[in-house]
């Protein structure tokens, strides 16, 4: 089985796979870690520096870079026609990116064609993706709230869960009328304690570093 990268256009929803659709073979995959945004201030009369990186409550991250190298055996004329097809779909476009090595997650980023080349037999293309810091779980997480104390586990990324409830509900002393409430409940990394006097459904998108 050939390892593939799947690209899904954010704008159109059209999906293309590196081998099945483009006919190129993945030979190298680099997934960079997002760099923490470290902010320090030197204060006169103080040893070291003052670290304000978590001034807003939690550490933030820069974008991360994904880089993929693909190769194929083509005649030069056929190869440049293929490069044109790949570039038309990917270059400068924002994509959901699914890697073979992490089947439960996807990345979101803008793709660029870094380079392409060919010799008498071998064509090569390098695609870089400037991606958001977190990778996202493919499946949306659902949690059924019950009367009493609920423990909702969340991954690394802080999220705001949507709440759907058929009747009025109070969660951690806040009252929500019947209906759908978008981005209603803040969930941080780990176990979140929610005290409810009714029932409802939480849905949220989990993300990991």
Per-region residue spans from a language model:
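Extracellular/virion structural assembly segments
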Residues: 1-209
């Amino acid at each position: 089985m050939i390892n593939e990268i799947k690209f899904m256009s954010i704008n159109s929803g059209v999906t293309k796979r590196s081998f099945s659709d483009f006919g190129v073979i993945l030979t190298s995959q680099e997934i960079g870690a997002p760099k923490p945004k470290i902010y320090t201030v030197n204060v006169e009369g103080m040893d070291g520096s003052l670290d304000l990186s978590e001034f807003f409550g939690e550490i933030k991250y820069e974008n991360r870079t994904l880089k993929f190298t693909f190769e194929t055996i083509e005649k030069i004329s056929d190869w440049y026609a293929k490069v044109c097809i790949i570039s038309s779909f990917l270059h400068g476009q924002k994509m959901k990116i699914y890697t073979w090595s992490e089947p439960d997650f996807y990345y979101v980023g803008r793709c660029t064609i870094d380079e392409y080349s060919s010799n008498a037999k071998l064509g090569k293309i390098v695609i870089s993706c400037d991606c958001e810091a977190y990778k996202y779980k493919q499946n949306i997480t659902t949690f059924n709230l019950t009367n009493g104390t609920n423990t909702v586990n969340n991954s690394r990324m802080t999220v705001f869960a949507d709440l759907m409830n058929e009747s009025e509900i109070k969660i951690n002393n806040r009252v929500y009328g019947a209906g759908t409430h978008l981005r209603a409940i803040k969930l941080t990394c780990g176990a979140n304690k929610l005290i409810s006097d009714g029932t409802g459904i939480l849905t949220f998108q989990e993300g990991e570093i």
